[in-house]
């Protein structure tokens, strides 16, 4: 059977950029909420020689993700899952951000691990903001509730986001905490799924030149200034990195977060 690569948020941005670097012998399944974006991405990738299938999916819905798994499994062996779907602070309120970013990641990992076997890989896209989470708010015992006490998890995480002053800052804190969860959860899954031979890795991009990144640029000039190149990252740079991380030749790369922020996180230590 042919190998299948599923990319959530595959209609644009980093998801689409990653798809371009996936082996053309691998069947691509792109999913997202906006069908028009998916169809445009499909045309681009097919013109480059890829076989592409589309399915709409809201990752915050466990039912949607289950149906996505069934669809992908009907096409071949699910070898790779790139989970890049998510919402940024400018796109939604704290509740929706946490539901899509955190619960969405939980849904994707828990459902796809049932359909994957030895040699499979899940790459969860987090964010460099995960490293900015206030220590007193990072409570792994709360994170653990996501799998079995989802309502309590949501209530706690939304309450944390609302601690910040101002609507944008509330969404910003919720985003930071949701991505901190993604980093932690990917590491947890890496050790749990290892028995099946499935690798799990998270990737934390800095500010990237995508539609989502542009929405946040005005609030993040200091982050751009702190990078070594004094610019935002390009989607194709992240796409190549993610596709490389997912490559089976990187079999020892697992249970860790890969920070790709152009040096912004260390800039404050060395910039003069």
Task: List where the protein language model places each region.
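Conserved glycine-rich cofactor-binding loop
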Residues: 9-12
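Conserved glycine-rich Rossmann-like NAD(P)H-binding loop of the short-chain dehydrogenase/reductase
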Residues: 25-40
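Rossmann-fold cofactor-recognition segment
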Residues: 45-63
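Conserved NAD(P)H cofactor-binding loop of Rossmann-fold oxidoreductase domains
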Residues: 84-89, 263
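Catalytic loop of short-chain dehydrogenase/reductase
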Residues: 89-91, 121-195
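C-terminal helical subdomain
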Residues: 107, 174-175, 202, 222-253, ...
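Short, small/polar-rich loop/turn modules that mediate ligand/substrate recognition or access, typified
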Residues: 194, 199, 253-255
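Short C-terminal tail/terminal secondary-structure segment
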Residues: 254-272
């Amino acid at each position: 059977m042919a190998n299948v690569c599923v990319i959530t948020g595959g209609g644009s941005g980093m998801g689409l950029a990653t798809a371009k670097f996936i082996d053309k012998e691998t069947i691509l399944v792109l999913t997202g909420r906006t069908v028009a974006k998916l169809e445009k991405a499909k045309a681009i990738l097919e013109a480059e020689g890829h076989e592409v299938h589309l399915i709409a999916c809201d990752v915050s819905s466990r039912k949607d993700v289950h149906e996505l798994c069934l669809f992908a499994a009907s096409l071949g062996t699910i070898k790779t899952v790139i989970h890049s779907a998510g919402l940024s602070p400018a796109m939604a309120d704290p509740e929706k951000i946490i539901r899509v970013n955190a619960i969405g990641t939980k849904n994707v990992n828990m459902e796809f691990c049932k359909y994957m076997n030895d040699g499979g890989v899940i790459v969860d896209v987090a964010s460099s903001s995960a490293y900015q989470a206030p220590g007193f708010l990072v409570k792994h015992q709360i994170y653990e509730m996501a799998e079995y006490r989802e309502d309590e998890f949501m209530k706690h995480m939304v309450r944390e986001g609302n601690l910040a002053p101002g609507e944008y800052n509330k969404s910003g804190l919720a985003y930071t905490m949701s991505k901190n969860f993604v980093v932690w959860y990917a590491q947890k899954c890496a050790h749990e799924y290892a028995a099946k031979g499935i690798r799990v890795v998270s990737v934390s991009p800095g500010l990237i030149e995508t539609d989502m990144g542009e929405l946040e640029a005005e609030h993040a000039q200091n982050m751009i200034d702190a990078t070594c190149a004094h610019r935002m990252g390009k989607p194709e740079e992240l796409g190549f990195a993610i596709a490389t991380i997912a490559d089976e030749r990187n079999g020892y790369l697992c249970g860790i977060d890969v920070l790709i922020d152009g040096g912004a996180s260390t800039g404050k230590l060395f910039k003069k």
